[in-house]
Amino acid sequence: TPSNSSAASDVYKRQGLIAGGDTALRNPVEGAEDDENRGWEELVEHQINEKDTVIGIAASGTTPYVIGALREARKHGVLTGCITSNPDSPMAAEANVAIEMIVGPEYVTGSSRMKSGTGQKMILNMISTSVMIQLGRVKGNKMVNMQLSNHKLVERGTRMIMEELGLNHDHAQKLLLLHGSVKNAIDAYRYSQDH
């Protein structure tokens, strides 16, 4: 899931794959999820290696596209995980780490986009937030390495610098725009004050 956190491209990349490719985001691609080999083929196209982590997602835990990708990734030394709503599923058996949510029956039988989909999204948010914290992209409860992609985020970053350093708005914003991130602006300012 894309976020506002500016993860350095050499350190943390995320890539989402879906059975049926980009088309499947808007239209059904019949049979795509039943191809047990295609998931791994797509991972290879994205140059997967043993430094990566693959997280398979399927509410049922029985989707061949995901199972095949996890099986082959693990065979090639890639750390694998999965998120499913079906305990002891075939997908969980192929993952190094299985997250098996208990969500109970869906309100509309078979509509896994409801409780299962919501739970999966929450877990992905927790994983990506934890990664950003471990990479030092978060200070306290603030994203200090966010992408300055719009006015709202520039203003948010400016306020963070103002709070942290006690600077006025103009000075804080100039630092932010000069250094490209809240973290870099704060570090540069503190360094300049010490030297």
Outline where the language-model segments fall.
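Single conserved hydrophobic/aromatic residue that forms the stacking wall/gate
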Residues: 1-8, 12
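Short alpha-helices
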Residues: 84-141, 151
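Short, amphipathic alpha-helical interaction segments embedded in low-complexity terminal/linker regions
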Residues: 131-195
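Ligand-binding beta-strand-loop-alpha-helix segment within the catalytic cores
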Residues: 21-53
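Short, well-ordered beta-strand core segments
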Residues: 54, 80, 98-100
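Gly-rich Lys/Arg/Thr-decorated short loops/hinges at beta-loop-alpha junctions or inter-strand turns
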Residues: 16-26, 139, 154
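Short glycine/serine/threonine-rich phosphate/pyrophosphate-binding segments
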Residues: 50, 60-69, 91
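Surface-exposed amphipathic alpha-helices with a cationic face
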Residues: 70-75
